[in-house]
Each structure stands twice: as C-alpha cells, then as structure tokens.
Amino acid sequence: MTVRVRVAPSPTGDPHVGTAYMSLFNLAFARRHGGAFVLRIEDTDRSRYVADSEQQIFDSLRWLGLDWDEGPDKGGPYGPYRQSERLDTYRPYVDQLLASGHAYYCWCSPERLAAMREEQQRRRQPPGYDRLCYGKTREERARLGGFSERPVVRMLIPDDVPLTFPDLIRGQVSAPRPDDQVILKADGFPTYHFAVVVDDHLMAITHVVRGEEWISSTPKHLLLYDWLGWPRPQFAHMPLLRNPDKSKISKRKNPAARLLWFKEQGYLPEALRNFLALMGYSMPDGREVFSFDEMVAEFDWSRVNPVGPVFDVTKLDWLNGHYIRSLPVDDLAERLIPYLQEARLIGTPVTPREDALLRAAAPLVQERIAHLTEAAELLAFLLRPEEEFGIEPDAAQRVLGRDAAASLRAAIDALEPLADWTASAIHAALQAALVDGLGLKPRHAFTPVRVAITGRTVSPPLFESMELLGRDRSLARLRRAAAIADAGGADSAGVGPGSAVRTD
C-alpha cells in the first residue's frame, strides 16, 4: 500500500496556523513511508470564500517548507484538486444513497428548523433533526407546515450506528451519536461531511490525519464509506493547539493563529516547523531542537501526545533565537533584506554598497535578536542616511548631560590621530583615553560614546559598529554629541517626550 495523506484547507481568509500544524504531521508521515502528500482546496462554502486566500495558503505553506506532491497548482492523477471544480462528482453518490435507503429528502424550511432547535433547547432535549420529512413524498410533506420548495438531502443514521473506531494516536475512540447529517445542500453543493469522504476515497487517501474536533464526525464518515462500499482509511486525530487558557487557538483571539503573522514577525520557517513539531511530538532522545528530516527519520504515531498543547510563543522565541544564531552570516544577511527594506533602511533592489555593509553588519546583531524584525532597530544607525540620524530622546536625556562632555572630547582627541581604524584599535584608544586616562569605569566611559554613535543605549558591539560606520561619520557624531553635552545636555537642546535629538 502506498501511503497517501492530505490537508484540505478552506480559502476563507488568512491561513490558520493549524493548517501548517496538520500539514507538518501529514508530510512527515508521508515522507517516512515514501508516500504522497496532497493539498486539496475545499471551497464549496461560497459565502465565506475569500479570493486571494488560496494563494496565501500556497505561499505560506511553501515559505514554511511544507510543499505538496499533488494540488491545484501542480495537478496530479486524481485532480481536479478544488472541490468547486468537482461538483459533478458528488451527485451520483447522493443518488446512490437515496436509492439504497440510506438518505432521504428534507423539505423543512430554515424557519421550521430554527423553531425545532429552540423547542429542543427549551425542553433540554439533545439537538438533532426530528425526521419530519423521512418516509414522506414531496406532496405529503407540502401539506405540513414549514415547507421549502428547495430540499436538502440527509443521511438516515441507523439506531445501531457504531460509535467507536480505532485511532492511530488515541487507540479505541468513542464518539457521540450523530444526527441525520445534511449531505447535499439546497443549492446543489455537497456539505463538507459528504464531499470530504467522496474526495478522500476518489483520491485514494489511505490515512486521514486531522484535528481532534473531527472525532465526533467520524462515525457518520465511516457510515458513508460503508454504505458506498468503499474501504475505510485509517484515522489519526491530532491534539488541537490551545491558548494559555486552554481554549482552542483562533484568529479572533490570538494573532499567532494567523500563519502569515509568523513571517511578519520575523520568525524563521525552520524554527516554526520545529516548534509546531514540539506541540505534538517528542523525539526518542527527548531533544527539543531537531530538523524536519530528523523528525521524519524517527516518526511514529505512538510518539504523538494526544493532550492539547499550549501554544507558548516564549518557547518559539527561544527556538527562533537559536536558529538565527546557527545561520551562516551570508544566509542571515539575505533573510534580513525584506525586513530592512520594509523599514526603508535599504533600497529595492539592494545596491552593492548596501549588500556589502549588511553582510559585514549581520554578525553584530546575530547574537542579539530573537526575531529578524529586531535587526532594523539595531542597524538603523548604520544604514540610515546621515541626515536622518538622531539620538533617542530618553538616551540623550539620561546620558548626554554636562558630565559626558569631557569623556566625549577625550574620545575625539584619542580617535582623531588613529591611523588603524579597526575595532581593536578603536577599543585600545578609547580604553587608554577614558578608562586609564580619566579613571572612568568602562560602563561610564563607553555609554556616552555608544549613544553618540548609535543613538541608543543598547546597540550592537560598539567598536565593531564604529569600524563599519567609518572614521568620518564616527567622529562627526562624537562632535555633535559633545556639542549637545557642552550646551547642558538634552534639556538645553530642547528635547522632550516624543521628540528626537538630531545630530545634523
């Protein structure tokens, strides 16, 4: 048997992180057994359809490195891979169920169904269709109230419907009794529950890997397989990703539920893959950092934890920092480019000068960022045009008072004659002038210099930053900062909350 698995997202908005989570485990299982991973778009709910959502699904899964073997954009032997392009597929199977007595027409109007549900709630009865239409012809049903000219088709759930089934993750699973599920809507579109079974069978899906919220639907899905004379696939119901309050993670409550949010926030795809794997899987040796290929090599359903994991972004931040620190410098520089372009610190396209400067600067921030987005703030002093450089108001107020003037002047005097403009030479000159010469502690000696050079109290390594900034720009910034300090500091320069100390 060739393993075939699928994910089947709906294009109803921004892709959900759960789509990536399910894709990861489907793909890992398929790769472990040399099988195929299928992407199917379930777009029959036209009321919620969003035009560009399908492309976002493609782009976000590919960004995450979770590519598929067959799908709408690739084709394959079991296409088409959009449900809306398969509508002629479903009706013959509905007719087969009607003919065999496993389904029936229902002419109840939406108003009649709403009133029925309200009455069931009032009487504290289990919800479900009351079978008013079952066994009646259209004419017989039309004589009763709440009639609709446009019928739906419902499954006829037998009294002895099996409610247990084997699951690859959970063992033997019990589910609640289903009611008479609609399988064909009044507009002629199949419902999810019917289309998913037909499509999975016709696409030769051998294993259905999906979230635990579908456990309650599995008995009716299994009935459809049996009634249509099809072999059952095996099921694996994954634990749901949950918020810290244990509620299901949703885009309404948690921005991290949006798959695109992770790219926007500067997470690496390999870090997010690792994190999503940890949400449901443990490696045999207990390690937390592992690649997708390492996960595939060890993959076994017995290692999936059925308990819903809490989506802890703090752990993801730690993993992301680890992966950033592990990148080759040129790779890191390349990945920083779109975020620096978004911040308008480098151009599009990147100039040769910008490219060289970025590759030299990337090591300065590699140990200091947990997100790629954080590099823009740290490197702005280096990449921004000199006429746009400014000192943060808080840094100016706290550091560039009159007592900083002497150390800044001493720094200028020490650096002006320096022939070797390298980080080590800059460090030695400032150490001799400020620490040895003025008797200052290193923190007090170098902080005014840091603020003068970078505009911030927290920055990449100071001496390496000055080397990249260059002699002329470094000395010019020191002179401007010294002038601010000579004038009585930031207060004398008219700096207040929300303003900035310009150094031009």
Swiss-Prot record:
Entry-linked SUPFAM superfamilies: An anticodon-binding domain of class I aminoacyl-tRNA synthetases (SSF48163), Nucleotidylyl transferase (SSF52374)
PANTHER family: GLUTAMATE--TRNA LIGASE (PTHR43311), GLUTAMATE--TRNA LIGASE, MITOCHONDRIAL-RELATED (PTHR43311:SF2)
Residue positions of motif 'HIGH' region: 9-19
Main location: cytoplasm
Gene (UniProt): gltX
Motif ('KMSKS' region): 248-252
Name recorded for this polypeptide: Glutamate--tRNA ligase
A GO BP entry: glutamyl-tRNA aminoacylation
Top-rank EC class of the record's enzyme: ligase
This enzyme's EC code(s): 6.1.1.17
Subunit note: Monomer.
UniProt keyword Aminoacyl-tRNA synthetase present: yes
Keyword Ligase belongs to the record: yes
Subcellular location: Cytoplasm
Annotated catalysed reactions: tRNA(Glu) + L-glutamate + ATP = L-glutamyl-tRNA(Glu) + AMP + diphosphate
One Gene Ontology MF term: tRNA binding
UniProt record similarity statement: Belongs to the class-I aminoacyl-tRNA synthetase family. Glutamate--tRNA ligase type 1 subfamily.
Keywords linked to the UniProt accession: Aminoacyl-tRNA synthetase, ATP-binding, Cytoplasm, Ligase, Nucleotide-binding, Protein biosynthesis
GO cellular component: cytosol
Residues that coordinate or bind ATP: K251
Domain of life: Bacteria
